[in-house]
């Protein structure tokens, strides 16, 4: 159990590169390629029908092994880029006697990490006191890796997250024209879409808050925008079609260490975390009905993620769409119960389990369309359960926090990996101060104790169609950066707070744009 309680970035014994598979390489040569994967992408991951011989080998009929292999390759590749920064930089800085050090250092950095820094960055880092210079260069290198990841993500679409047609069809058949998901800001939930639920990132609007304490008013404004787009443009469907908006909240818990590795925002109290998320869903639904009438009702869904193994509690709504904490199914139990069933029987068993869950507690069953959708999502989660079983021996070695950086602002679609980033949606530091404080507290344990800086990436999205939108987003990003350094001066002064302001046009698939920030201004002054 001591191994499970570790919260630093420790690689599992099963953390290894994927052995080349000729068949897989032919269809998807790299984790970042733009090769067409056909039915291999995010269509629920269950298109290939398993034979009886496959089931005899212990493979669940609803698990997509090829997709798991592909996702693992991406995860290992991206995380290694961030995890090796410290050791590579220390090796380089230990050899400052090299002739033409800056040029040599950049060559070494690119050869080992695939990124390079500007000559000004290297000169500034070398001029600073040893530890502060290392912290400066660490931040610059990590930010360069993020920009590289962002470009790869939006240009090459390595997770096929822009291919959302099949998933959209599933939700529309269930009566939903749009999906919003509100997970906790905890980095152990950052992969909720692409991995846990196996959904394309472009399908759902994701905005994370510590403890799932999302802003109800902001969520209502987004709902109004979606409904207006339906009315004016007929997108994603016509306003007179009988479909609704689906709002999903995701809290989290840990069965291995419930009193320490649960939700920090709720004191690792699982019931409080679930109750708070449910109350936010109720408030959101009530706000829309109060403002726009009962005919404008939305559907809500509550999920609980076990961050030890990525299995879930799926809280089953009744016939009226009401959610209750006591009505839920556990995907790990359903995974085991359906292990030896063929594809069609396993799917039917899931639908039966959803219906009987409510009946056992004297409640009504969900609408048939919702039963089918929930069954599909649970089946998707089976692939993630198998993923953790295969590559993490059934339980993550880093069951606690092990994030590499903090992301604040909006967007961050390119962050789709578990424990890569602590991400919190905010408009201003003042409004999101509680979320940011939680992130800073986490990184004091992860980084500061080891002499590493806390890297914070700021993202402000803009609408490229709107005149002045980019300028306003830039001013906002720089304002947030300044507010961070003012609030956390005890970290900023010794170089333990490194920040990168970025922008992105959310109307396109273009990557993040780097802005010159406070660190760049200071570096320019030092080298002038």
Swiss-Prot record:
Residues 17-47 are annotated as: Disordered. Its cofactor is Zn(2+). Disruption phenotype: Cells do not grow in low DIC levels. Cells lose carboxysomes when grown under low DIC conditions. Accumulates intracellular DIC normally, poor CO(2) fixation. GO terms for biological process: carbon fixation. InterPro entries: Carboxysome_shell_carb_anhy, CsoSCA_C, CsoSCA_C_sf, CsoSCA_cat, CsoSCA_N, CsoSCA_N_sf. Homodimer. The keyword Cell wall biogenesis/degradation does not apply. Binds 1 Zn(2+) per monomer. It is an enzyme of class 4 (lyase). One of its GO terms (molecular function) is carbonate dehydratase activity. It holds the Pfam family CsoSCA_cat. It is found in: Carboxysome. The active site is at 186 (proton acceptor). GO terms for cellular component: carboxysome. It comes from Hydrogenovibrio crunogenus (strain DSM 25203 / XCL-2). It catalyses: hydrogencarbonate + H(+) = CO2 + H2O. Belongs to the beta-class carbonic anhydrase family. CsoSCA subfamily. This is Carboxysome shell carbonic anhydrase. Its EC number is 4.2.1.1. Its main location: other. Induction: Induced by growth in low levels of dissolved inorganic carbon (DIC) (at protein level). Reversible hydration of carbon dioxide. This bacteria encodes at least 3 CA enzymes. Essential for chemolithotrophic carbon dioxide fixation, supplies CO(2) to RuBisCO (ribulose bisphosphate carboxylase, cbbL-cbbS) in the carboxysome. The keyword Nuclease does not apply. Inhibited by ethoxyzolamide and dithiothreitol (in crude extracts upon expression in E.coli).
